[in-house]
């Protein structure tokens, strides 16, 4: 069945070192890739091993045409797309223009199919531009608020509610409960700048799971549930069933079972 997408979807995942931010972005990337999408991803780790901020960027740029084998459906085809001007000796195609849409092709396969490359000004980087993310998943309140700058108007924000005290703040004896950060996000939602704000209570979730790990996967499940509930065009790419398969093959065997339980719990929060 042919499944095509003409727009791209930007996701930012945020947390602190040790919360599974990088793993979460990789699971989302693998899930979209298996669904036939072109995906770019990157992480900015910083001082992760010292409890520092970690960001994962996932950019779903389009979908392969699954009926055409190795062929592709290049996202965006309009008058503003870059035009192909010449074919080199090695089979590379040189685009004459680089526009704001994603349409340039870089190579021609033996069977006549093309492989896309992105030469646009908007999507040449795997990092999500500020103000362009449609989905933000945060594992810690202050990190969610810090990463909120990446969100577009009307974005979906899924965040954990329980704070994780930064080591430097703990050493100084500072107090931090996350309430001010959550209140700021709720104000953004009330004023319409956040399309939907979903607060996931860490303590309640962990009590139901029976263990205090895999919060990241719980929030992934919650985000997938909201996409499915809202009939998002990306729900088929980032489906619950697809993510189950990714976890089964991408997570260490001893951790598969409780990650699947965490995914199910998060998904059921929204469906």
Positions of the model-derived regions?
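Long, intrinsically disordered low-complexity tandem-repeat segments
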Residues: 75-120
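Active-site cofactor/cluster-binding pocket
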Residues: 2-71, 120-271
